[in-house]
């Protein structure tokens, strides 16, 4: 399969203005073709952008990214898997986001054609997000308790149950017909 790798180093990826403020990018980006299946793989390895003010040695602002994304598609299904971490640091405060998500669409009403509307099918979701800082932490989990049933004529879901669980409780949304859904909050 085809692939491309971009490597960023401080020696080659630093820009400094006349006031001594610097932008630095380091890390690696790899994108590749998975082969016979339509799609891509994207990998970020410690890709970090930093802003240094007035010649300081510690960054004022820094965004670091690490993780993987994979998309696959056939005429019968689409699959997206992603697992990544982002960290944003502003002065001494750091906020992180960790994401692990899998989404699958299986066609039931005909083939999936690039550039055309999705046919009838089912959608499943399973994922976790964690956002944390030195002061707070929030966790969210998404899951399809029953696959979401997509109807092309409706342009939306006509069946299925999606559950979102977070700190303090969960929300369950149930679709029963085109444009008809109910959401219920269940406290911990």
PLM segments and residue spans:
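Low-complexity, intrinsically disordered segments exposed to solvent
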Residues: 1-188
């Amino acid at each position: 399969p085809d692939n491309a790798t971009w490597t960023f180093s401080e020696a080659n990826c630093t820009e400094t203005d006349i006031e001594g403020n610097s932008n630095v990018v380091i890390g690696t980006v790899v994108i590749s073709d998975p082969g016979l299946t339509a799609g891509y793989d994207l990998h970020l390895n410690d890709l970090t952008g930093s802003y240094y003010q007035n010649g300081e040695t510690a960054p004022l602002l820094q965004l670091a990214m690490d993780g993987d994304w994979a998309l696959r598609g056939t005429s019968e299904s689409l699959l997206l898997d992603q697992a990544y971490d982002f960290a944003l640091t502003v002065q001494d405060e750091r906020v992180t986001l960790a994401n692990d998500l899998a989404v699958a669409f299986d066609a039931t009403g005909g083939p999936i054609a690039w550039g055309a509307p999705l046919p009838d099918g089912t959608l499943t979701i399973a994922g976790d997000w964690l956002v944390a800082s030195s002061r707070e932490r929030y966790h969210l989990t998404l899951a399809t308790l029953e696959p979401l049933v997509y109807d092309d004529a409706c342009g939306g879901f006509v069946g299925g149950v999606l559950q979102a669980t977070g700190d303090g409780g969960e929300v369950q949304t149930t679709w029963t017909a085109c444009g008809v859904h109910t959401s219920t909050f269940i406290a911990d």
